[in-house]
């Protein structure tokens, strides 16, 4: 469910970027930057849990995937920056 939600949020933002431009789609882009990496981390974490101790060993790529995805959450700014941007975009719609 969460994976499909991330996929559809991404597709919605892509359509908006193509039709009205990146500036107007900025809120959707910021939402993706928060939501998609968090969903990926949850999925990887579940896979690690299913594999037990082997999930964090060198015998599976899961520990490395988790580390890479966790780093990605910081690459374009921490989640808090993007959450603040979403709040500003959304509140800006009602402030005149």
Q: For each predicted feature, which ranges?
A:
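Alpha-helical interface subdomain recognition
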Residues: 1-96
């Amino acid at each position: 469910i969460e994976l499909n939600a991330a996929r559809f949020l991404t597709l919605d933002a892509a359509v908006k970027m193509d039709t009205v431009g990146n500036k107007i789609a900025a809120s959707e882009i910021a939402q993706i930057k928060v939501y998609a990496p968090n969903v990926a981390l949850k999925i990887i974490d579940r896979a690690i849990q299913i594999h037990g101790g082997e999930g964090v060993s060198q015998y599976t790529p899961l520990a490395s995937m988790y580390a890479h995805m966790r780093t990605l959450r910081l690459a374009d700014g921490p989640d808090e920056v993007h959450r603040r941007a979403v709040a500003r975009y959304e509140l800006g719609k009602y402030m005149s």
